[in-house]
Amino acid sequence: MAYKYLMILIATCTTVVYFIPYACNDFYNHFIDTYHITYGQAGDLLTFFGITAVIGYFIGGWVADKFNPKMLVVWSAILTGLAGTVVAFSTSFTILKIMYFLFGITSTCMHWSAFLKVIKNIGEDDEQ
């Protein structure tokens, strides 16, 4: 029974961690209107996120091996939520750039490899 709830918790954390950075893409026109930015600036935000995410994929495995993957999943969800809160209340494009850079770190470098490692460790040998 605990296995089921742990899987639900991990799936929820992963959904939150990956929804928040992509909200700019999902609600593109609303995002541009709300923050009074241009299409190019919105593209810049996703570029900052994308570059950081690509680098994060390369070092994320090392991070997941070096630190406790369960704690990485938890902390990545907390930090992504805090960064999302800053984005929600920010009116500065510079702050948005910093937060989208941080999203790349929290979602890929900290979360993705740790998430995969936690899922692997939860399963039995015959479930691999």
Locate each region found by the language model:
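Residue-level signature of mid-helix packing/kink "hotspots" within the transmembrane helices
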Residues: Y22, F49-F58
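Paired small-residue
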Residues: A83, T94-L102
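Cytoplasmic helix-loop-helix junction between adjacent transmembrane helices
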Residues: F101-Q128
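Pair of pore-lining "gating" transmembrane helices in MFS-fold secondary transporters
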Residues: A2-F27
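Helix-to-loop junctions at the C-terminal end of transmembrane segments
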Residues: G56-N68
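C-terminal ends and interior cores of transmembrane alpha-helices
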Residues: I78-S92
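Membrane-interface helix caps of multi-pass secondary transporters
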Residues: A23-H36, I119
